[in-house]
């Protein structure tokens, strides 16, 4: 699923690039593809019926596991940081290479790398289990640090950009494939919805977070906020590591 999502992004980015040659507003026509997809979904996807839905139950309201809210926060931060990297990359690259530099070619590679990383998720997750999550976060920390120190160094900037595409392709599938371990069957759908809402919140607040990180560094350097983001994910890595190991020792 994750790989197909990245493939769809690649195709639609390409179509938007073709349409923008007609008119910049024409590029927004790519969103129209949602209508036939919605129609296909409505006509072909069957309703999911719980076999036990007809069995009378004591309707006791279940409490959501606090771990779910931690995952929502993680989703917010992960998407926020990913969007910040994509948005700020063009400005940093232009500062290094000059105003005539076209950053879109490198950004177009991101979904392709996401596809490759997505296909690798299954074997890696089978091999190292929860280490997949740790490794994804470590790659994100390295990505942020490389971008943070890439002032004038295009190699560091590109390496950081490409590494950032791995994290989402590994962390989100890991979270969703293990969500049933922290929720019940009655709350898993709501928990999934909350995580997706967290992704949208992260997308929305990315520019605000970038400005706040820039303010905290007291620097006008375009790469400065990524030191803050790297620090945040270092904390997340330690919290995740100790929380999962504490749970396993019980």
Functional labels for PLM-detected ranges:
Residues 67-108, 114:
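Extracytoplasmic gate region of multi-pass secondary transporters
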Residues 1-43:
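Helix-loop-helix hairpin linking two adjacent transmembrane segments in secondary transporters
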Residues 18-32, 212-233:
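A membrane-interface helix-boundary motif in multi-pass transporters
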Residues 180-219:
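A late C-terminal transmembrane helix in Major Facilitator Superfamily
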């Amino acid at each position: 699923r994750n790989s197909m999502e990245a493939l769809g992004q690649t195709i639609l980015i390409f179509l938007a690039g073709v349409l923008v040659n007609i008119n910049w507003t024409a590029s927004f026509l790519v969103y129209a593809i949602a209508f036939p997809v919605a129609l296909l979904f409505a006509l072909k996807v069957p309703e999911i019926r719980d076999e036990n839905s007809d069995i009378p139950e004591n309707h006791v309201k279940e409490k959501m596991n606090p771990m779910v809210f931690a995952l929502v926060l993680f989703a917010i931060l992960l998407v926020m940081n990913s969007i910040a990297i994509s948005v700020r990359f063009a400005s940093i690259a232009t500062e290094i290479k000059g105003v005539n530099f076209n950053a879109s070619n490198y950004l177009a590679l991101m979904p392709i790398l996401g596809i490759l990383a997505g296909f690798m998720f299954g074997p890696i997750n089978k091999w190292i289990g929860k280490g997949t999550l740790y490794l994804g976060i470590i790659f994100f920390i390295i990505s942020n640090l490389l971008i943070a120190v890439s002032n004038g160094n295009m190699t560091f900037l590109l390496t950081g950009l490409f590494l950032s595409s791995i994290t989402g392709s590994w962390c989100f599938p890991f979270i969703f494939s293990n969500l049933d371990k922290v929720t019940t069957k009655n709350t898993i759908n709501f928990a999934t919805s909350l995580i997706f809402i967290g992704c949208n919140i992260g997308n929305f607040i990315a520019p605000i977070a970038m400005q706040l990180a820039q303010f905290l560094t007291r620097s006008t350097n375009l790469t400065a906020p990524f030191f803050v983001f790297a620090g945040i994910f270092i904390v997340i890595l330690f919290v995740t590591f100790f929380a999962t190991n504490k749970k396993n020792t019980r």
